[in-house]
Amino acid sequence: MREEVLKRILLIIGAILMAIICLFPFIWMIVVSFAEDPTFLGSPLVEYKSTLENYVRVLSDPTLHFPAYLKNSIIIASLVTLTTVSISSLAAYAVSRIEFKGRLLIPIFVLGLSMFPQISLVGYLFKFIEKLGWVNTYQALYFPYVAWTLPLSLWILLSYFSQLPKDLDEAAMIDGASRIKTLTTIILPLSAPALFSTALLVFIAAFNEFMFALLFTTDHRARTVPVGIALFQGVHGEIPWGSVMAASVISTIPLVIMALLFQKYIVSGLTAGALKGE
């Protein structure tokens, strides 16, 4: 009995410590974003005073272009998510449900391509994008992002689809349903948790991507939030930590809230495919 109580106490302490470690960066980011004078970070003599000035500046200062960065990130990430999940759903269904020669090599090939680091592809991609005249356009980020997020999406959905009984497909085809109709009316509704978790992970990955956005965009017309925040500068070239943190809060907190609200579906979508019979 004492051992069980001790284990329970240790688990609770571990969970609390983990929560503190995970939440501390966000809490600190919020604290600094409301600071009137961020120099309190390095001097105990500077009093902490809260203000909304940093948020007002980020949203209204025309030199920062933050609303444009946020719009670009949302549009690109949304398009990438829609495309990636759609393509990976079709591919995962074909590999998991249709017998054809070499089908098992497809996920291995896709996974192998994803093992190449981004930096090794940047030079070739930039030359290709430059020849197409896509530098500083949505296309310059859209297509690389789709290729970059497709392996993750395919593997998650493939592991989930593989656990669904094939009797469902056979019953649907006996009733005269085509493969596409079977996918859209039976498989996808049953795979809602996996689809949702995949879509959220793809959206976050595309929203937070930095390297391609830094190299393939030149100004606010196509630049995304991570690069835009990294390039924030004050009047004299200093880093405006208050504005940086305010912009980070605006762009990060909605994603965190969304992940917390739908964590049940995310966890079930990521784990169900790994459990036999799920």
Swiss-Prot record:
ABC transmembrane type-1 domain mapped to chain residues: 70-262
InterPro entries in the cross-refs: BP-dep_ABC_trans_perm, MetI-like, MetI-like_sf
Membrane topology summary: Multi-pass membrane protein
GO biological processes: transmembrane transport
Keyword Cell membrane: yes
Primary localisation category: membrane
SUPFAM superfamilies: MetI-like
Transmembrane stretches, start-end: 12-32, 74-94, 106-126, 141-161, 186-206, 242-262
Annotated localization: Cell membrane
Record keywords: Cell membrane, Membrane, Sugar transport, Transmembrane, Transmembrane helix, Transport
Cellular component GO terms held in the UniProt record: ATP-binding cassette (ABC) transporter complex
Role played: Part of the ABC transporter complex MalEFGK involved in trehalose/maltose import. Responsible for the translocation of the substrate across the membrane.
Family: Belongs to the binding-protein-dependent transport system permease family.
Subunit note: The complex is composed of two ATP-binding proteins (MalK), two transmembrane proteins (MalG and MalF) and a solute-binding protein (MalE).
Protein name as catalogued: Trehalose/maltose transport system permease protein MalG
Organism: Thermococcus litoralis (strain ATCC 51850 / DSM 5473 / JCM 8560 / NS-C)
Upper classification of the organism: Archaea, Methanobacteriati, Methanobacteriota, Thermococci, Thermococcales
